[in-house]
């Protein structure tokens, strides 16, 4: 069974833990208890393949930023979460993305942009703004509500699909390199 290491990143209070717990335990956590770092595992079937999701729920608080490099190194894919009622959390996405690319030493890291709290009546981040940002990054965008469960499975499952596409692309590139290295050199 394939295991996928997913990491949930974003500013404090955007609902990273609420999304993760909604996926794993099917319930909404109402009270805010800042996370230092929690790990969850769940077996799911995505597109007919049984797989194990190993989800790292991270601290959004700045005082824990030193821990980020470590979990970014081990993660295969990242849910970059902001709250639709918090413009600053949306602006912070750029910093998380840059840090992930730096730590992974790659421009091409599987990510999904997630706009959480879409059940709230007032929003300060427009859907189009988020779609445009995701398009500029070349990643999917999904709106979620940890409270109503809207889009929760979709966000995590889309990330797994992004990781699969990335692995497929990497293995194709690896095969191309191997083919090239088998050509014979003739000296005259």
From Swiss-Prot:
Residues 167-188 are annotated as: Disordered. This is GTPase KRas. Its EC number is 3.6.5.2. Ras proteins bind GDP/GTP and possess intrinsic GTPase activity. Plays an important role in the regulation of cell proliferation. May play a role in promoting oncogenic events by inducing transcriptional silencing of tumor suppressor genes (TSGs). Residues 186-188 form a propeptide. A lipid is attached at residue 185 (S-farnesyl cysteine). A motif (Effector region) lies at residues 32-40. GO terms for biological process: signal transduction. NCBIfam families: small_GTP. It is an enzyme of class 3 (hydrolase). Belongs to the small GTPase superfamily. Ras family. Disulfide bonds: none annotated. It catalyses: GTP + H2O = GDP + phosphate + H(+). PROSITE patterns: RAS (PS51421). GO terms for cellular component: cytoplasm; cytoplasmic side of plasma membrane. It is a lipid-anchor. GTP binds at residues 10-18, 29-35, 59-60, 116-119. Keywords: Cell membrane, Cytoplasm, GTP-binding, Hydrolase, Lipoprotein, Membrane, Methylation, Nucleotide-binding, Prenylation. It holds the Pfam family Ras. It is found in: Cell membrane; Cytoplasm. The modification Cysteine methyl ester is found at residue 185. Alternates between an inactive form bound to GDP and an active form bound to GTP. Activated by a guanine nucleotide-exchange factor (GEF) and inactivated by a GTPase-activating protein (GAP). One of its GO terms (molecular function) is G protein activity. InterPro entries: P-loop_NTPase, Small_GTP-bd, Small_GTPase, Small_GTPase_Ras-type.
